[in-house]
Structure formats: C-alpha cells, structure tokens
C-alpha cells in the first residue's frame, strides 16, 4: 500500500481455505481440544492474531467487501487542531496513500475481521454440539481499538476512544440480562476479578480491577468507575488518559506541557473536537485531572500548558 515504505501495510486475498492461515489452524486445534476434553472442567484461552497486520485472509472474506462499496472516512473541516502528541511521530507516513490505497486497507481490515469472526463461530459451534452453554462462561475481547483513516491515521497507539476502546462480549449461564448491550465504561483489568468471582473463588486483595458482576446482572447499573489508558510518545514521555461516563480527558506529559484534550466520546467518538480550553467545561476537566492524579500520583499540572493550537 502507498509507496511501499510501510512494510507492514500489506494485504493479500489468499487462495485456500481457513486452515491455510495460522488463525484457521489455531481454531481447528482449539475445536479438537474442546471436543476431546469437554466432559472435564476446562479453561481455554484462544488468542487469534487477526485482524492484525499484515492483512491476509482467504479470498472469500475479501469478496464480502467489494472495493467500490468501501466508504472512506472524511475528517470534518471544522475539527479542532490536533495536540502535538495525539498521534505518533510516524503520522506523515500515510500521506503517500491515495484513495485506492485507503479503500484496499479498509477492505482488508474488514476481511480479516470477518475471517476471525468465522473462527470464533467454530468454537461456539462446539458449545452447541456438546450442549455446554449451561455451564460455560464465554468472553470475547480485543486488546485495542484501531483507526481506519480518522485524523489521517491508519493504526493503533492512540488514546482517542476509537484507539483505546475494545470489544468485550460476555456470556454467563444463568444470569439475567444476557444479550443486552451497555454503555457502562469498564476496564480489561476488571476481567480477572470478574471471572474469579463467577467461579466462586475469593479474589486476591489489592486488585486494581473490579468485578463486573453488577453490570452483568443489570446493564444499566450506576457504575461510576473511571477507565485509564496510557500510551508512550517520544520527547514528552507518557500520555495519560481517563474515561468517565461520556467524557475522556488526556494529558500529555507528566506536567501537561505536551497538551490537554477533553472529548465528548458519545457525540464525538472520533475525538475531533477538543474542549480542554473551553471555560464551560473547566470543572469537568479538573475533576477528570483529579482522577488521573489519584491513579498516577507523579503527574502534575504545569502553570502554562500547551493549547490545542500548539501555542503557549
């Protein structure tokens, strides 16, 4: 894709079936394991690689997405200027992409996602065949989000909600509320104490995570727990971000000298509009900074911080 300088930005609609690919082989082995051991108590973790680059999947999954039907993202003209460290230093590398490159990239990403979806389905089919749904907990999750052209970026490693938010789907037998969706903000740190509790065990003390049991029982439960994300940037160090309810606040650098961001992630999930310098949101900004300070005690606030325009 592009001028070829981005070695990982490659795609291939491969000949052959699912098991010609590593994730297809993994799914087949996991199916064999389940069918052999299903009568015993089991814990099975299956980590698929896709939709990670390089974007290779069997051709049948690419055929689901005709190139001329792929819609490209258009950043709004009135968006706020980006904070200097909002994107990695390699931001300019995608300037060589033309519209055809962008369509092929997005198509390949979706094809790889559909490919993995089919592999997950093979595992769930075993639960059907062996009648395991009544005593098996199932968790489907990812490890990060992804940009598909938003802010001109085609990768991960951001703290925008589209970069930090992950899929998380759970099935717990015997629980009311299964099949419901929730906008409750949780962390992957919460998964361990949740599974320990569902297994009837006592979780260790001093865990940072919190059991999601109340959310599983009542998806609309009042849950005011912040979720934290960090990402490393050269020169400024760490970016610290907190999501609480509908809002995300980010501070670049320990003293905030790299910039501040405040986004309404429900109305603006891509993070196009920065409200950090808006006096109407100063109380919200300071409250969220206070949560960051509790979680990361070494951070502070510089007397003068970089505005969204990059000027001091």
Whereabouts are the PLM-identified features?
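C-terminal cap/loop subdomain of S1 sulfatases and analogous C-terminal strand-loop tails that border
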Residues: 144-150, 156, 189-192, 197-265, ...
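Alpha-helical elements of the RecA-like P-loop NTPase motor core of helicases
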Residues: 28, 273, 286
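Active-site-proximal cap/lid insertion segments
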Residues: 1-28, 32-185, 198-201, 205-206, ...
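Short, local alpha-helical segments
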Residues: 12-14, 235, 271-274
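A short, flexible beta-alpha/helix-coil linker loop
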Residues: 174-177, 268-272
């Amino acid at each position: 894709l592009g001028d070829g300088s981005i070695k990982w930005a490659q795609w291939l609609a491969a000949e052959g079936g699912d098991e010609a690919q590593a994730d297809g082989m993994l799914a087949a082995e996991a199916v064999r394991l389940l069918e052999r051991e299903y009568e015993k108590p089991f814990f099975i973790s299956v980590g698929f690689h896709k939709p990670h680059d390089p974007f290779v999947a069997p051709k049948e999954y690419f055929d689901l997405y005709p190139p001329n039907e792929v819609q490209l993202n258009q950043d709004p003209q009135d968006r706020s200027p980006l904070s200097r460290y909002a994107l990695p230093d390699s931001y300019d590398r995608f300037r060589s992409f033309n519209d055809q490159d962008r369509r092929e990239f997005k198509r390949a990403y979706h094809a790889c996602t559909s490919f993995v979806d089919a592999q997950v389905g093979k595992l769930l089919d075993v639960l059907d065949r062996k009648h395991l749904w009544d005593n098996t907990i199932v968790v489907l999750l990812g490890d990060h989000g992804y940009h598909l052209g938003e802010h001109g970026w085609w990768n991960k490693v951001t703290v925008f909600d589209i970069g930090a938010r992950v899929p998380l789907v759970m099935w717990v037998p015997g629980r009311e509320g299964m099949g419901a969706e929730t906008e409750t903000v949780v962390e992957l740190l919460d998964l361990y104490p949740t599974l320990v509790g569902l297994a009837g065990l006592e979780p260790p003390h001093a865990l940072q995570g919190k059991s999601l049991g109340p959310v599983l029982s009542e998806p609309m439960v009042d849950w005011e727990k912040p979720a934290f994300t960090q990402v490393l940037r050269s020169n400024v160090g760490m970016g610290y971000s907190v999501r609480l309810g509908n809002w995300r606040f980010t501070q670049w650098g320990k003293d905030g000298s790299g910039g501040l961001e405040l986004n309404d992630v429900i109305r603006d999930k891509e993070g196009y509009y920065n409200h950090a310098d808006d006096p109407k949101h100063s109380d919200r900004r300071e409250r969220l900074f206070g949560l960051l300070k509790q979680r990361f005690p070494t951070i502070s606030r510089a007397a003068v911080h970089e505005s969204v325009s990059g000027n001091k």
